[in-house]
């Protein structure tokens, strides 16, 4: 339930291991407590920030048997992000696959060979393998940061709208935990905002 990166971060931020948090909260938290009660207890009794009170509460609630948003039986922990922009889907796709576009979501790679089975790795350590290619529509691949224990599954869709605009949809599955889900939600939101600015107003 808790990935290695979350465990490292909670130790760094709070000075207490995740295993120690589980023991402490197991002694303090009632089984019928609401999410808000658990979060407020963590913040007030353990002197952690509101953000980390939220994370620890969400992660602990999974141990209590509660299922957080963004978790499914088949796809594990997942996140979906999308943005619509006033450009053609061909323009968006071509930019995504250019070295400039690739730098936004894979890193420094000279090119990406759009062939099923092609393996890639950027200088920053993002690596994976392409599993599905439908040019100017869909790309499916594995996607793993160098510090991750396991790869995620990434799908990128480029879709034309009825108004002549283009929606780019990103769906990422098999993330370690809901903490990483939020990290990646922020990452893809920022990536799409940057992509939109560069596609609509290129340098």
Where are these regions (language model features)?
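Hydrophobic ligand-binding cavity/cleft-lining segments
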Residues: 41-111
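Short, highly charged C-terminal tails/helix-capping segments
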Residues: 197-203
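Hydrophobic pocket/interface hotspot
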Residues: 92-93, 102, 130, 141, ...
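Glycine-rich portal/gate segments that line the openings of hydrophobic small-molecule binding cavities
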Residues: 97-147
